[in-house]
Amino acid sequence: MSHYTLSWHDQLNEYHEIGEYATDAFEAVKHAREDVPYIHEHPFCLDTIIKED
């Protein structure tokens, strides 16, 4: 399991990040959608997904 940092901008152009532990990037996005209502409502808002070392 690896740590992923996901980032996005909301409708006010404010920058946000969330960290998720997952086996791959797809699972990290799935967890983020479950944890953050904005990502769930706007599934294509993610700017970056970075796998941390």
Regions found by a protein language model. Name each.
Residues W8-Q11, K30, P37:
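Helix-coil modules at protein/domain termini and other flexible surface or pore-lining loops
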Residues M1-Y4, A22, D47:
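Intrinsically disordered/low-complexity terminal segments and short unstructured peptides
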Residues H3, E27-A28:
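Generic alpha-helical structural signal
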Residues N13-E27:
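A short, exposed loop/beta-hairpin motif centered on an aromatic-Gly-Thr core
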Residues S7, A25, I50-E52:
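Serine/threonine-rich, low-complexity intrinsically disordered segments
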Residues M1-H16:
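Short aromatic-glycine-(Arg/Gly/Cys) micro-motifs in beta-strand/loop hairpins
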Residues Y15, R33-D53:
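Short, mixed-charge low-complexity intrinsically disordered segments
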